[in-house]
Amino acid sequence: MALRVYPTATLPRFPSTLSLRTTKFMVKSSNLQLQMQSNDSRKLVLEVKEKLENEYHSLPVGRNGRDDEDMILWFLKDRKFDVEEAASKLSKAIKWRQDFEVSNLTEESVKDIAQTGKAYIHDFLDINDRPVLVVVAAKHFPKAQDPADDERLCVFLIEKALSKLPTGKEEILGIFDLRGFGAENADFKYLTFLFEVFYYYYPKRLSQVLFVDAPFMFKQFWRLVKPLLKS
């Protein structure tokens, strides 16, 4: 995941074609299907699938479940095709999705917190055809807003971004608009949640993060949270 700081004048450009909004999210298979034609990859996917069935039988099946071969392959790639590590990490991710009730998240369920404008999916893909998740830091007030609502909005928007992936694309772009960021917007706990979500449950989905117009105060705050980043 690449991190870059942009001044206001050089905000990334977006193409002029509007992407369709959706309320029901189905993550497109992209080129994972093509990769699975590799005999070695296919063999490893089946090994993980069998391991999950034998050792984590209580986990759900279906899309984003223990028999979802696209998801299995993605976690194998994340774990450098180590079957044991992929099965372990994926089992925890599936259990988390179940506990967090990810499948029940809807536009309506996050409507109130979304109306603050603190985060949203941009209407356009970026110039590399990646869905764009925008965070407006100056609208985040941890002392006045329910952290559980913030977490649900975060996961809902990640799911929404992934549902907009064009065929052949697998990653999204994150933009943090830091104009007006102050001490009242700093939230160490929420950033910890954000890092953990992308590392454990959506690994390698966030390809790049751009910080726009970062003030000095944020740079000091970032020095404290940067050690939390995992490769």
Language model feature labels by segment:
Residues 2-204, 208-212, 217-231:
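SEC14/CRAL-TRIO lipid-binding/transfer domains and related phosphoinositide-recognition modules
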